[in-house]
Amino acid sequence: MSVVETVLVALALGCDAFAVGMGVGTRFCNPRQIFRLSFHFGLFQMMMPIAGWFVGSRAADLVSTWGPWISFALLLFIGGKMAYESFRSLEAEDGECPDPTKGSSLVMLSVATSMDALGVGFSFGILGQQLFLSAVWIGITAGIMTWGAMRLGNRLSRQFGRRMETVGGLILVAIAVKLLLF
C-alpha cells in the first residue's frame, strides 16, 4: 500500500474519532481532557489494526457481523447519557455532567471509534500488507483529528451556548444509528 493510500485509510478511520471528539468537546475541552481523549483514540486506532492482524482472517466474519452492533450499543449508551445529562444540567445549572474522557466511558468510546480499524487489521493480514507503519499513521491521524474536533466542538459550544452539549450527545447517537444503517 502506498503512503497516499495509507493516509487515506487513516483519514477515513479517523472520521468517527473526529465526530465523537467534536461531540465531547462541546462540554469537555481543557488541555488534560483533550490530551486524554486524543491520546486514547489514537492509541486504540493504532492497536486495533494490530490486534485484527494477529487474530487473523478466521474471525473476520465475526467482527463484520458483531462489530457494528458493539459500536452501536457503546455510542448509543454514551451519547444518550451525554444528551440526558446536558438536559438535566440545563434544568439545574449547577448539575455536574460526568466526564467522558475518564474511566470506563473513555475506554468504551475508544473501543467504539476503533472497531473499523480492527476490520482494517484483518484486511491487512489477509492481504499481507505492511502493518506497523500503517497502524502508526492511523493512530497519529486519529489523535490529531480528535484534538482538532474537540477544539471545534468547544468553539461551537461557546458560540451557541449550553445546548451544544445536547447536540454533542445527539451526534454520538446519530453515529450509532449510522453504524447499523450503512
Swiss-Prot record:
**PANTHER family per record:** MANGANESE EFFLUX PUMP MNTP-RELATED
Q: Where in the cell is it found?
A: Cell inner membrane
The UniProt gene name for this protein comes to mntP
Q: Which GO terms describe its molecular function?
A: manganese ion transmembrane transporter activity
Protein name as catalogued: Putative manganese efflux pump MntP
Instruction: Give one Pfam hit by family name.
Output: Mntp
Q: Which residues cross the membrane?
A: 6-26, 37-57, 59-79, 104-126, 131-149, 164-181
Any one GO cellular component localisation term in the record: plasma membrane
Q: Which UniProt keywords apply?
A: Cell inner membrane, Cell membrane, Ion transport, Manganese, Membrane, Transmembrane, Transmembrane helix, Transport
